[in-house]
Amino acid sequence: MSEDLAKQLASYKAQLQQVEAALSGNGENEDLLKLKKDLQEVIELTKDLLSTQPSETLASSDSFASTQPTHSWKVGDKCMAVWSEDGQCYEAEIEEIDEENGTAAITFAGYGNAEVTPLLNLKPVEEGRKAKEDSGNKPMSKKEMIAQQREYKKKKALKKAQRIKELEQEREDQKVKWQQFNNRAYSKNKKGQVKRSIFASPESVTGKVGVGTCGIADKPMTQYQDTSKYNVRHLMPQ
């Protein structure tokens, strides 16, 4: 599925580039502007579907860490961290620290779940507990945590399925609009006046293929006149 979405994303981006190129010469065309907006929207939807779990984890942790804390962590420290499965914070212990990438491997106390999370998302235990108390949250039991995890995954799957459906509909709409755009680009310039290629077959036996007509289609070519007698000697005074 990810491979298909990646191909679709590349196709949408290519179409957007062509629309932007067309707009450079006709920036007020409403159809092109609407098509550009729709393509940008479907590109964002596709990017969102291709987003990885770490990105979702970082986004879910925004409610837990509104500001980036500054704390010197070391292996064995207790902390409060966000669990990626439900977006809630729990007490954990730091098992390993990757200073280069700014991440820590942690294990949630009482549950045994291991996870790698950015150091900036960790909070001291007391500060984290106070934040949970202020928000009215109570520590969950393991059974409650598993049930919440199951419900979270179910909702996430339903939401993803709905977004995929919307994306497919957007793709079909864009396909039709893009075909209409291409058809207009090669259709007649004015009603009743069809634009013809200069390489089209002539309608009469005297017409020449590849010669611009400029309104004199099917007329004989202008006869060549020999002007060699008008050389420089005729211009010299006698």
UniProtKB/Swiss-Prot annotation:
A Gene Ontology biological process noted in the UniProt record is:
mRNA processing
Q: Molecular function terms in GO for this entry?
A: RNA binding
Phosphoserine-modified residues are where? S201
Tissue expression, as annotated, is: Detected at intermediate levels in skeletal muscle, and at low levels in heart and pancreas.
Task: State where the protein is found.
Answer: Nucleus speckle; Nucleus, Cajal body
> Where would I find the Tudor domain in this sequence?
72-132
Q: Where does the record place the modification N6-acetyllysine? A: K219
State how it assembles.
Associates with spliceosomes. Associates with U4/U5/U6 tri-snRNP and with U2 snRNP. Interacts (via Tudor domain) with SNRPD3 (via C-terminus); the interaction is direct.
> This protein is called what?
Survival of motor neuron-related-splicing factor 30
- What is the species listed in this Swiss-Prot or TrEMBL entry? Homo sapiens
